[in-house]
């Protein structure tokens, strides 16, 4: 075994777990809660929700099955298991509720990638809702199916803007990209664990197979560098259930107050409302 952080583990484990979790599969909390904190000491880990061997992110929320007929192999090529969900209609649709749900799911996926430890990777075009029309293996094509479409639709513009702000938010909070994996304990006696899990009750995460929600709190002080002022604590709630869920939120540290920065169903608040904090 070689320990070298310049090497990275590029595999589909995070993607498969994230896609299952996002579309509401049962018994995913134990797996996804580990994946978002994974940052092994030996090599880096690359997190993504789409790559060149499967659906684009937009297609993962728009198609239940692959459409590779144009490849000339009778649709036998390409990954069979894409862990996708079309949100109610196969392919493009004009139904507003379905498109709103797809947009919401895309934001959920991007948030999982960019709010997790490890190295985030966004497949080119996913930030602009690029589609391959359900083709998950267009390596042999040189046409509009394989070309990256830099969309100018309202949805594409909204997703691009959301992605930019999410990247900015990650850069502003070192606690989201620590040099080592969180230990889930207060090993420096700061008053809070470096990372902790919560659920409908604060400090109690119920990872039962039927649950589809949990939350994470990061103690920003664990990201203090060279004596610089400690960062804000972060509380991130994940709910992939199809109904609203109430979360228990721990008391803020040192008489601070919690402030909402963004939600995937409504987007980011204005910078003056806390994105810089």
What are these regions (language model features)?
Residues 152-183, 198-201:
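Aromatic- and carboxylate-lined catalytic core of secreted/periplasmic carbohydrate-active enzymes
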Residues 53, 114, 133, 167, ...:
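Hydrophobic alpha-helix feature that most strongly marks membrane-spanning transmembrane helices
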Residues 92-103, 149-157, 275-277:
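Active-site rim elements
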Residues 132-164, 257-270:
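Extended hydrophobic/aromatic segments used for targeting, binding, or gating
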Residues 193-201, 271-276:
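Surface-exposed intrinsically disordered loops and tails
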Residues 1-124, 128, 137-141, 174-177, ...:
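Conserved alpha/beta catalytic core and glycan-binding cleft of carbohydrate-active enzymes
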Residues 198-250:
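Carbohydrate-binding surface patches
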Residues 242-277:
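C-terminal beta-sandwich/jelly-roll accessory domains of carbohydrate-active enzymes
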